[in-house]
Each structure stands twice: as structure tokens, then as C-alpha cells.
């Protein structure tokens, strides 16, 4: 069998950047990592609870964390920030206070900024959430995959591959189904590829969704 490497880790330093930007001493490195994870989880939970459309979708493409001695800067890249901010002018402040409560750092200030993504459906996380929503509503998986591909065409990408694994349509035996449109060169390091794997809980069991999006060649 072909061994698949994670396309993001494979391209770190060429077309992919890190989502956490900070230095730490070896002793305190693991604490820093756990702190990052806490911040990300806290933000995702808050967004899930407070989205205007309560579909369980977050619309978060990625969360970047930059740390300095006295400041933690968090940048949330969202596809549809309006759904979170509209009607609640203090939405970002509330979120900031929530995250600050989570970890009690006395001497560090936390700053959260939300950035809107121009083409949300060019982001695999947002697409995966869309497919997950469709599968939960018992839409046929083929229909969901085709609709997702139509959405990426608006974001003028060069290729997309979607894979769904598990008890598809509630069948007894788990299987893997996939669909590809355009080019997805996984072995070309200079090819900019966005990737995500997403777990969705349906009434039949857990399904795994993987999405590769080929954006551009550098």
C-alpha cells in the first residue's frame, strides 16, 4: 500500500507556514503546546455555541498563535465572521474574556483578531464542515461530495480530492469512497496544497472526511 504522508507537514518551510509562532525552552515547550491547544479548543467551543446559525459549523479555516513575553496574539481566519459578530458588537471582546478565563496568565495580555477569508470554500476545513452537515441530515454522500466540488469551483482552485470513510449511508460494512476533480499532485513539494481531516458523528457511527485542495504551484 502507498504510505501517505501528511501534505502540510511535508511542505513546511516551502509552501506551508507554521500556525504557532513562538520559541520556548525545552523544559517549558510542552506547556506551550498544551496552552495553544487550550486556546484553540476554547475558541472553537465559543464559536460553536454563539454562531447565529446553530448548525455546529464553525467556519474557522485556521487559528494562528503568536507569542511574545508579555502578549499572546491570536488571529482567527474565518469564512463567515458576520455570523459570529453581527448583532453582538462585543462578540470579540466576549471571546477574549472567555479565553483569558480559561488560562490564568497574570503577566500576559491576550489579543484576538478575526480576519475574513475572501474565498471560504477554497478552505478544506470549511468544506469538511459543510459535508459533515449534509451527512448528518442524511443527504446521500455522493450528492454532498458533488455539491462541495461545485462550491470549490467558485474559489477557482486547480483541483480537489474528497475522501469519506466509514459506515457510509448506514451500510453494515465500512468502506472508503473518494472523488477527484482536476489535478492534485501530492508528491510535488512546490505545489500549494491545503488539507484537512475531519471526524463527523452520524447516527450510524463515526465517519472520517479527508479533503485535499490544490491551490497553486509556486
UniProtKB/Swiss-Prot annotation:
InterPro entries hit by this protein: KH_dom-like_a/b, KH_dom_type_2, KH_sf_prok-type, Ribosomal_S3_C_sf, Ribosomal_uS3_bac-typ, Ribosomal_uS3_C
A GO MF label: rRNA binding
A UniProt-annotated Pfam family: Ribosomal_S3_C
GO cellular component terms given for this protein: chloroplast; cytosolic small ribosomal subunit
Keyword annotations of the record: Chloroplast, Plastid, Ribonucleoprotein, Ribosomal protein, RNA-binding, rRNA-binding
Main location: plastid
Top-rank lineage group of the source organism: Eukaryota
Keyword RNA-binding: yes
GO biological process, one term: translation
Protein's cellular compartments: Plastid, Chloroplast
Entry-linked Gene3D superfamilies: 3.30.300.20, Ribosomal protein S3, C-terminal domain
Location of the KH type-2 domain: 43-118
UniProt keyword annotation of Chloroplast present: yes
Subunit organization: Part of the 30S ribosomal subunit.
PANTHER family, sorted: 30S/40S RIBOSOMAL PROTEIN S3 (PTHR11760), SMALL RIBOSOMAL SUBUNIT PROTEIN US3C (PTHR11760:SF19)
Family: Belongs to the universal ribosomal protein uS3 family.
NCBIfam families the record matches: rpsC_bact
Protein name, per record: Small ribosomal subunit protein uS3c
Gene behind the chain: rps3
Amino acid at each position: 500500500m502507498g504510505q501517505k504522508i501528511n501534505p502540510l507537514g511535508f511542505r513546511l518551510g516551502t509552501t506551508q507556514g507554521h500556525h504557532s509562532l513562538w520559541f520556548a525552552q525545552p523544559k517549558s515547550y510542552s506547556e506551550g503546546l498544551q496552552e495553544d491547544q487550550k486556546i484553540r479548543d476554547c475558541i472553537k467551543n465559543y464559536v460553536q455555541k454563539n454562531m447565529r446559525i446553530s448548525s455546529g459549523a464553525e467556519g474557522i479555516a485556521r487559528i494562528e498563535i503568536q507569542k511574545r513575553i508579555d502578549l499572546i496574539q491570536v488571529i482567527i481566519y474565518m469564512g463567515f465572521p458576520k455570523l459570529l459578530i453581527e448583532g453582538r458588537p462585543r462578540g470579540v471582546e466576549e471571546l477574549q474574556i472567555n479565553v483569558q478565563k480559561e488560562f490564568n496568565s497574570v503577566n500576559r495580555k491576550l489579543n484576538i483578531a478575526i480576519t475574513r477569508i475572501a474565498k471560504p470554500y477554497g478552505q478544506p476545513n470549511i468544506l469538511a464542515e459543510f459535508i459533515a452537515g449534509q451527512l448528518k441530515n442524511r443527504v446521500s454522500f455522493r450528492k454532498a461530495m458533488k455539491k462541495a466540488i461545485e462550491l470549490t469551483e467558485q474559489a477557482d482552485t486547480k483541483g480537489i480530492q474528497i475522501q469519506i470513510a466509514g459506515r457510509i449511508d448506514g451500510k453494515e460494512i465500512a468502506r472508503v469512497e473518494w472523488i477527484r476533480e482536476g489535478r492534485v499532485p501530492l508528491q510535488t513539494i512546490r505545489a500549494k496544497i491545503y488539507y484537512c481531516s475531519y471526524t463527523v458523528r452520524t447516527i450510524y457511527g463515526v465517519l472520517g472526511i479527508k479533503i485535499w485542495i490544490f491551490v497553486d504551484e509556486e
